[in-house]
């Protein structure tokens, strides 16, 4: 399902543990790390899609998590030109996402990356709050920044943790 602007409706999932560290997963067979995410089907609400994607990608069910909140609006990213499938109809130019902040209330041993085949991830770890912004693929970075900034007060009511700057690259001598 792609909207009239070419964006595929999608949900993103930020899962926190009790130490307020975030679930960070490695895409199978790649060195790319990301939060769980996935498309919203025509007959689904964003909340229903989030629970389905959570189960498919992590093996966790509603009994394992508490929904802390979600973004107010859709957050959009465009795909780089080389990833756009120009021969599909309609053409998908990117994703629009509602992001959910969850807290793990079950045991992390319940995480099963192989609960659905084919699996999307082959490894996962807990990371500091701002680390995903530095490690995610470049074209998703601004959406991660917006989602993390908007949802941080829900996880850190006493004040947002310090945001680490992205490393700068140097050119020339």
Curated annotation (Swiss-Prot):
Its cofactor is a divalent metal cation. InterPro entries: NUDIX_hydrolase-like_dom_sf, NUDIX_hydrolase_CS, NUDIX_hydrolase_dom, RppH. Keywords: Hydrolase. Residues 6-149 form the Nudix hydrolase domain. GO terms for molecular function: pyrophosphatase activity. It is an enzyme of class 3 (hydrolase). Accelerates the degradation of transcripts by removing pyrophosphate from the 5'-end of triphosphorylated RNA, leading to a more labile monophosphorylated state that can stimulate subsequent ribonuclease cleavage. This is RNA pyrophosphohydrolase. It comes from Thioalkalivibrio sulfidiphilus (strain HL-EbGR7). The lineage of its organism: Bacteria, Pseudomonadati, Pseudomonadota, Gammaproteobacteria, Chromatiales.
